[in-house]
UniProtKB/Swiss-Prot annotation:
PANTHER family referenced in this protein's UniProt entry, alphabetically: PROTEIN PSIB-RELATED-RELATED, PROTEIN PSIG
Signal peptide limits: 1-23
Protein name, entry field: Protein psiG
GO CC annotations, alphabetized: extracellular region; membrane
Region (Disordered) location: 687-706
Encoding gene, per UniProt annotation: psiG-1
Biased composition (Polar residues): 693-706
Gene source species: Dictyostelium discoideum (Social amoeba)
Ranges facing Extracellular side: 24-644
Subcellular localization: Membrane
Superkingdom: Eukaryota
Length: 706
């Protein structure tokens, strides 16, 4: 007997140390439950219906399903008892006037024999006496297995999560009423409608998923009618919450604990108040209001009056109004003087550099004058002329470089070399000089030698012609006084080579958003500039100080994961790219908050016997996943010889222990062991040695309980 007892102790010790390393026994899923009231939404507790496929779209937009049609007579809606289309968003989203949101745990239990997690509740009433039913007057619905028992029958539930696909998973559901399951944002199970318990199965191996890749798993369930509520889930999907908002809701939007109107109101009507970004970490004890966002309201300028400024007015509760006149810029450094503001054109200026002896150019706030070189270039660059500008005479003028000598000898004529402009004199002979010319003060002596005898042919004195074709030169024959009267050109025109021509620069209004034109009649026209759109993906505007400005065309995003972009002038959408910081971290986009980061899960080659280990990249090696044996190994992963030996002695060491106990204590020993262990070994819940056979004959070792 002592030997047997010793053996028992040893075997029990072995059994204690042979731990089976496996998955968690229980997995908890945080779910959001939205309590509904039939008196607020008649889609809850309507007439009886049945299953109705096709009520929602096949692609999940955001974190909640959307209806497949806007037509209330859409057949799936009629069959599914859905009438209040505008209230459907409140089934799975918080709305303080339509529902009460609650957070609950859904605990799934592992069946070790199948490695399947399950949740089974024939009476699934998770929010009795809660939500709207805190008010006793709302507790008016009865049913369930105890038909007269009160229950909260009207609610919707959602779970948003992610999982790493292992390659073998399935998902099974049975229950009532509406159930929709999305994997990778695609509808894979549709049990919509108001119906008794219905079942459906999703085989993930048929969805085209890639092993070891992350996918979203979104589950939506509604209980809409008495008298029953059943939920049964069976799955081996290892779903988890990639991130939670600051309210503790998995992939939540922060609305559970933040109301922008109540928590974020800064009493400034000129700001747009919003709750913090959902994934913003908020230290415990801090108020959410400390992290609220307040964006200033931007007012657009009115198109019909460019001389006023609009802004947000606190006095009119945040309306955009005219708050002042436009302050036109000082353009003195450009030699421009403000003349006023035109409502259609904006600020108007005139140039200070318009004048007979001004070039029209401005240099650091000073107008450039016409000097000798400028006038020489304008009037012909004759080396025998002296060029200058005289404002009174209308601009540039040219006078002879070489004049008559001071001597009174009329026969001494000044000369100038045409190539170098060297002055000299030439003395005429008596024939050339004296032909009895009678001269007035505006004439000089000249004898025509082409005839014999020479005759007098007087010439105008040199000072009459100023060399400027834009002046009218007049000499008083009595006094000899010479005047140079500028030709009159109206408005913006200016004389050039004796003709009045339009000068565009004379119409410069200092506004780069106008096209300035000088007409032949001298009037200025300022036409608003139309910016030439050379790139259809650019939006062009005009700034009076810098002209046309092109900025990229803004294409709106759709949610947080679809980025708007412009292609050949057309707005399109593309997926937001989220970069992972390391090999062992996954970055992907969440519709609620944008890019998120969570730890990578490596899928082992043999999940029953191994665990996946992620190893980050180093300077010499890339990142990788490795499969590592459980330590200690699960029994089913032992070498074949060990397993065979165990089978021989009774499937497991624990069985051997029981067998010895049976030898020692017979049937009562077995019963005592079974009772003390709550029949925890499924393979040994009965012992054929001590059971009465169901067929013919008797078992001599069978002892009925006394």
């Amino acid at each position: 007997m002592k030997i047997i007892l010793t053996l028992l102790i040893i075997l029990f010790s072995l059994n204690k140390n042979l731990n089976f390393v496996s998955s968690e026994v229980t997995k908890s899923r945080i779910c959001s439950i939205f309590d509904q009231l039939p008196k607020l939404n008649s889609d809850f507790e309507p007439d009886y219906g049945d299953i109705s496929v096709g009520m929602i779209k096949n692609v999940l937009e955001g974190d909640s399903p959307t209806l497949a049609s806007n037509d209330p007579n859409f057949k799936p809606f009629v069959n599914g008892k859905l009438k209040n289309l505008n209230l459907f968003p409140t089934w799975f989203n918080k709305n303080h006037t339509q529902n009460v949101m609650l957070l609950k745990k859904l605990n799934l239990t592992l069946d070790k024999s199948s490695n399947i997690y399950s949740f089974v509740k024939d009476d699934f009433f998770p929010i009795d006496y809660q939500g709207w039913d805190v008010d006793e007057s709302n507790r008016i619905y009865y049913g369930g297995r105890i038909f007269t028992a009160y229950h909260n029958f009207h609610y919707c539930l959602k779970i948003n999560s992610v999982f790493f696909y292992q390659g073998t998973e399935t998902f099974k559901f049975e229950g009532d009423d509406d159930v929709w399951v999305f994997i990778d944002k695609k509808l894979v199970l549709d049990l919509g409608g108001l119906h008794p318990a219905r079942r459906g199965t999703v085989d993930l191996t048929k969805l085209g998923l890639q092993v070891n890749k992350t996918y979203s798993f979104d589950f939506f369930y509604c209980e809409r009618h008495t008298p029953y509520s059943k939920m049964k889930i069976q799955t081996d999907i290892q779903a988890f919450c990639a991130w939670s908002d600051y309210c503790g809701v998995c992939q939540g939007d922060g609305s559970t604990c933040c109301n922008k109107d109540l928590d974020c109101d800064d009493d400034d009507p000129c700001t747009i108040d919003s709750c913090p970004l959902p994934n913003l970490p908020i230290p415990g004890g801090d108020k959410i209001s400390k992290y609220c966002r307040h964006t200033n309201i931007t007012c657009t300028q009115p198109s019909n009056n460019k001389c006023v400024i609009t802004g947000c007015s606190k006095d009119t509760n945040g309306k955009c109004e005219v708050i002042g006149n436009l302050e036109c810029a000082d353009k003195s450094k450009y030699c421009m003087t403000l003349t006023g503001c035109d409502p259609k054109l904006g600020c108007q200026y005139k140039s200070n550099c318009i004048g007979p002896c001004l070039t029209g150019e401005c240099n650091n706030g000073k107008c450039t004058s016409m000097d000798a070189d400028y006038c020489s270039n304008e009037l012909g660059e004759d080396p025998c002329k002296i060029y200058s500008c005289n404002a009174k005479n209308g601009g540039c003028m040219a006078t002879p470089k070489c004049t008559s000598p001071s001597s009174s000898n009329p026969c001494v004529i000044p000369t100038c070399s045409a190539d170098k402009g060297v002055c000299g004199t030439y003395t005429q002979n008596s024939t050339e000089c004296n032909c009895n010319c009678k001269l007035n003060p505006c004439q000089k002596n000249n004898c025509d030698q082409s005839v014999n005898p020479p005759v007098c042919s007087p010439l105008p004195i040199d000072t009459i012609d100023d060399g400027n074709p834009c002046t009218i030169d007049i000499c008083d024959k009595i006094t000899g006084s010479v005047k140079h009267t500028p030709m009159e050109c109206s408005g913006c025109t200016k004389c050039n080579n004796g003709k009045c021509i339009p000068i565009e620069s004379n119409c410069d209004d200092g506004n780069l958003c106008t096209i300035d034109q000088c007409m032949n009649n001298g009037s200025c026209i300022h036409t608003p500039l139309s910016c030439n759109i050379t790139n259809p993906c650019m939006d062009y505007t005009c700034n009076a100080d810098i002209g046309c400005v092109g900025v990229p065309k803004i294409c709106p995003n759709k949610g947080n994961c679809l980025i708007g972009y412009c292609d050949a002038g057309e707005c399109k959408l593309k997926d937001r790219i989220c970069d992972s910081p390391s090999f062992c971290q996954i970055s992907q986009c969440s519709d609620v908050t944008g890019c998120i980061v969570f730890d990578k899960v490596c899928i082992p080659s043999n999940p029953k016997c191994e665990t996946g280990v992620c190893i980050n990249a180093t300077s010499t090696e890339p990142g990788r996943c490795e499969s590592v044996d459980f330590d200690p190994k699960p029994f089913v992963c032992k070498p074949a010889a060990i397993i065979s030996t165990s089978v021989i002695v009774g499937v497991s060491v624990a069985a051997a222990v029981v067998a010895i106990a049976i030898v020692v204590a017979s049937k009562k020993g077995y019963d005592a062991w079974a009772a003390s262990n709550n029949n925890s070994l499924a393979s040994l819940t009965s012992n054929p040695l001590y059971e009465n056979p169901t067929g013919n004959g008797d078992n001599p070792m069978y002892q009925p309980n006394s």
